[in-house]
């Protein structure tokens, strides 16, 4: 009995010391987002993983505030309405010069449809490889999520565009019906032509 007890005691002391050294390296536990209250979040990379960070967003922007983009506004508004209604909808790339209202249009759509369950997830271009992890967290939720990548472009030889293409093509797996990707770019070609 005494030898087993002293070995067990030594083991527990050592395990305690190891845990004390490891715990500061572990990510802090994250609270689950209440999507009934939270309208937007940003994918935040942390080490080899990441988490959704809730954002406070303004719902002041209206689609009618955007001038000179009537056709684009109507097309994107119709696509978004179809998405909310559970009808087929397309991923969208908004292309144009800086300051032409591309990002504002997406935010105005959130303002218009938040009460109908539309939510916005911002994801940086450099984090596109994490798209499957982000989608995995959203797939079983009742809300409709637009994954929003602002200022999308790639350099020649970068592999990230292949990840994006496979997600858009649905070749990783069937894209969930409650997730759509909207991106903006001020480049005419997302990947430079050779």
Where are these regions (language model features)?
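Short loop/turn elements that form and flank the Walker-type P-loop nucleotide-binding site
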Residues: 87-89, 116-117, 140-143, 175-178
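AAA+/P-loop NTPase substrate/partner-engagement loops
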Residues: 112-145, 151-157
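Walker A/P-loop nucleotide-binding motif
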Residues: 86-108
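Dynamic helix-loop-helix/coil hinge segments at AAA+ ATPase domain boundaries and subdomain interfaces
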Residues: 3-9, 51-75
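Pre-Walker A adenine-sensing motif
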Residues: 71-85
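Conserved catalytic/switch belt of AAA+ P-loop NTPases
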Residues: 140, 155-194
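Interdomain "pre-motor" coupling segment immediately N-terminal to P-loop NTPase/helicase cores
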Residues: 2-54
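Phosphate-binding P-loop
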Residues: 55-57, 81-89
């Amino acid at each position: 009995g005494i030898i087993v007890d002293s070995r067990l005691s030594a083991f527990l002391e050592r395990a305690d010391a190891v845990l004390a050294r490891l715990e500061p390296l572990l990510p802090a536990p994250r609270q689950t987002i209440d999507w009934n209250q939270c309208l937007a979040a940003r994918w935040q990379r942390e080490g080899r993983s990441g988490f959704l960070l809730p954002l406070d967003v303004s719902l002041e922007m209206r689609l009618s505030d955007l001038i000179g983009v009537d056709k684009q506004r109507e097309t994107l508004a119709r696509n978004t309405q179809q998405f909310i209604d559970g009808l087929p909808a397309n991923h969208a790339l908004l292309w144009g010069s800086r300051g032409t209202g591309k990002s504002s249009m997406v935010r105005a759509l959130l303002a218009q449809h938040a009460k109908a369950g539309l939510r916005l997830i911002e994801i940086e271009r450099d984090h596109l490889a994490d798209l499957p992890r982000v989608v995995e967290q959203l797939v079983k939720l009742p809300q409709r999520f637009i994954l929003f990548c602002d200022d999308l472009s790639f350099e020649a030889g970068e592999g990230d565009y292949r990840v994006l293409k496979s997600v858009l093509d649905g070749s990783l797996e069937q894209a969930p019906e409650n997730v759509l990707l909207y991106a903006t770019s001020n480049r005419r070609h997302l990947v430079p032509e050779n």
